[in-house]
């Protein structure tokens, strides 16, 4: 299938060939890979958070490619600029570290300085005990908390999974960890709190 047709004297655009082929190659790769992830995750939604893993100058075009491919949001304003939107995100590990590892306090400060319409999603793996931290932030913020994000390192096993190890890979974010957090939240009446997962995800892992 033809992606682009250029008509005219070759010497008028020959010098641009490397430029436009490079743009097409990168953006179609981002778009194709994002689409595969979106389809694998369906009906769950996918957010595109690549900004920390590549050069900052590629954010705008990559974000647009991911948007076209079906990602519901991107992590920076630059990535969202071509369609007039804004970046989305979560309370980061660095902010939690700045408050001595106190996720509840860091989340409170994030809320204090955020607009009321911001959907608050906070990381809950700082202490490697996602169940405990998820419950702490849910109890502290109730309906103001939109979701918790599990981002456990691929080199670590979450505390809630230690006693359940057996016939599955226990490291990082895995289905058992997600189930543990979901059950704990539901048991205390926090069914409305969503769970966001990240870290090492690809089509096969999904």
Where are these regions (language model features)?
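Buried, small/hydrophobic-residue-enriched core segments of structured protein domains
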Residues: 4-188, 203-205
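Extended C-terminal subregions enriched in glycine
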Residues: 193-204
């Amino acid at each position: 299938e033809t992606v682009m047709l250029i008509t005219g004297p070759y010497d008028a655009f020959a010098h641009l060939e490397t430029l436009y082929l490079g743009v097409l190659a990168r953006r179609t790769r981002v778009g194709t890979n994002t689409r595969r992830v979106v389809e694998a995750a369906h009906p769950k939604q996918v957010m595109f958070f690549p900004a920390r893993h590549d050069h900052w100058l590629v954010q705008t075009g990559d974000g647009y490619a991911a948007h076209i491919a079906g990602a519901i949001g991107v992590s920076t304003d630059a990535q969202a600029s071509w369609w007039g939107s804004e970046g989305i995100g979560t309370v980061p590990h660095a902010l939690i570290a700045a408050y001595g590892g106190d996720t509840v306090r860091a989340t409170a400060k994030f809320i204090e300085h955020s607009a009321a319409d911001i959907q608050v999603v906070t990381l809950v793996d700082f202490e490697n005990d996602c169940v405990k931290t998820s419950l702490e932030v849910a109890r502290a913020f109730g309906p103001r908390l939109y979701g918790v994000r599990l981002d456990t390192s691929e080199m670590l096993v979450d505390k809630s999974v230690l006693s359940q190890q057996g016939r599955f890979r226990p490291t990082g974010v895995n289905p058992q960890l997600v189930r543990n957090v979901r059950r704990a939240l539901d048991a205390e009446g926090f069914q409305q709190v969503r769970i966001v997962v990240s870290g090492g995800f690809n089509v096969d892992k999904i």
